[in-house]
């Protein structure tokens, strides 16, 4: 199906996925409007670790999850937390999540994710060129470090998935590790380095570059909350009703991240979507502070330290608590002494506490494609931990759908009605 050339497209959501899609569609001649109650790039897109990794093929749920979850839930330093008051509402999603970790399913999911991630860097380069922002992407790679060979051996399953997907990675010894990152504690002796990865030291700056390019070319932005849709005589949505106005639309793209579930429901699609709430702390830069050259995952405590433009950022944790619960920074603050051990010289001065809502499906795959209910509705949400990384390739796939082009990436695995 091909939509009319130069049609009026309304995109709900001005995070990194919505912004990428807006600029991509606009570059192909479409009249694009963005609607979001929050400023562009200020929600989940704001606080990630800044990594764009070609080779993110390991789903969140893996075959050993059943054995690990009980210990994780009762370990105060664990990366996983569930708010027990939210469990009744979470249970259907959680059961699907655990089921997706079965060996055969996890292997299939990994293969399907690889069809997206293998193209993500190329797509980001094209998108950044549209915005004149290629300089924001730094080709420094993605590093995971471990204290010993036994800890590294524990990644065998992940590496097996990477091998079957043809992911480019290197096993590095202590000398190679500390050549890459001399500031990391010396008791880290082995690593896994993925060279095909870029780093964005200020994710918000990338969002703003895309938004600036979009508005300079005539794109329209309404900072308004979507309440409902108006439907035409043919049953298709023809306008978006917000808190301030009614905005006509020929074509709708739902790219509202964690807030997409209710919008999809109003448009006739029931989707299994919840939030993996993620936290970060930013630490002040000091003249004597540690040197870190790229985002680095520290095995064991399972957190990421990234050298952001405004200081070192600690990203950690998955909290399953929905959209309404207040943030709880207890766990991530408890990790600060560990982070200082991993990166000696790290300042203890916290300059920002942040929590964001990762829009997550139980099978770790985004929702990308045309609605089975309405031909003029497209979906682009549910990217979980990979919103930044998959934003540009998602935008290209949406543009291919609008243009009626063969993307060469099968979209059935990402359909909204797969659950």
Q: What are these model-predicted stretches?
A:
Residues 172-176, 180, 222-238:
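A conserved short coil-to-beta-strand element within the FAD-binding core of flavoproteins
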Residues 7-33:
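N-terminal Rossmann-like FAD-binding beta1-loop-alpha1 element of flavoenzymes
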Residues 91-212:
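Rossmann-like flavin
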Residues 27-46:
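Glycine-rich FAD pyrophosphate-binding loop
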Residues 5-7, 242-251:
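Core beta-strand elements of the Rossmann-like FAD/NAD(P) dinucleotide-binding domain
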Residues 50-51, 56, 60-100, 228-231, ...:
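Active-site substrate-recognition segment that forms the wall
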Residues 171, 232, 367, 371-419:
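C-terminal lid/capping helical subdomain adjacent to the catalytic/cofactor pocket in oxidative enzymes
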């Amino acid at each position: 199906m091909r939509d009319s050339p130069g049609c009026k497209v309304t995109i709900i959501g001005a995070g990194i996925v919505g912004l990428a899609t807006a600029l991509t569609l606009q570059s192909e001649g479409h009249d694009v409007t963005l609607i979001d109650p929050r400023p562009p790039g200020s929600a989940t897109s704001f606080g990630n670790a800044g990594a764009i990794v070609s080779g993110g093929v390991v789903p969140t749920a893996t075959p050993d999850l059943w054995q690990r979850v009980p210990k994780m839930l009762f370990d105060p330093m664990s990366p996983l937390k569930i708010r027990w008051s939210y469990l009744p509402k979470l249970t259907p999603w959680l059961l699907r999540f655990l089921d997706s970790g079965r060996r055969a399913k996890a292997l299939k999911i990994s293969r399907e994710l690889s069809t997206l991630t293998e193209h993500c860097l190329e797509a980001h380069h094209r998108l950044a060129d549209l915005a004149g922002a290629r300089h924001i992407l730094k080709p420094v790679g993605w590093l995971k470090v471990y204290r010993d060979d036994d800890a590294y051996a524990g990644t065998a399953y992940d590496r097996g998935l990477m091998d079957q997907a043809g992911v480019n990675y290197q096993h590095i010894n202590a000398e190679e590790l500390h050549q890459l990152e001399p500031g990391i504690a010396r008791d880290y002796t082995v690593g896994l380095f993925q060279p095909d990865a870029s780093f964005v030291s200020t994710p918000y700056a990338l969002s703003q570059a895309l938004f600036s390019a979009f508005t300079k070319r005539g794109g329209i932005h309404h900072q308004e909350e979507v309440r409902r849709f108006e439907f035409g005589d043919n049953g298709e949505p023809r306008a978006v009703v917000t808190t301030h106005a009614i905005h006509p639309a020929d074509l709708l793209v739902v790219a509202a991240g964690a807030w997409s579930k209710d919008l999809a429901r109003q448009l006739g699609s029931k989707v299994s979507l919840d939030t993996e709430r993620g936290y970060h702390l930013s630490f002040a830069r000091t003249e004597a502070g540690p040197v870190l050259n790229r985002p680095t995952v520290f095995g064991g405590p399972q957190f990421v330290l990234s050298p952001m433009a405004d200081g070192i950022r600690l990203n950690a944790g998955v909290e399953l608590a929905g959209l309404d619960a207040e943030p709880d920074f207890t766990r991530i603050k408890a990790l600060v002494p560990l982070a200082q051990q991993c990166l000696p010289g790290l300042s203890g001065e916290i300059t920002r506490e942040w929590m964001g809502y990762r829009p997550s499906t139980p099978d770790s795959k985004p929702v990308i494609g045309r609605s089975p209910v309405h031909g003029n509705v497209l979906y682009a949400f549910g990217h979980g931990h990979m919103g930044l990384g998959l934003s540009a390739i998602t935008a290209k796939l949406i543009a291919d759908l609008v243009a009626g082009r063969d993307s060469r990436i099968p979209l059935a695995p990402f359909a909204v009605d797969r659950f």
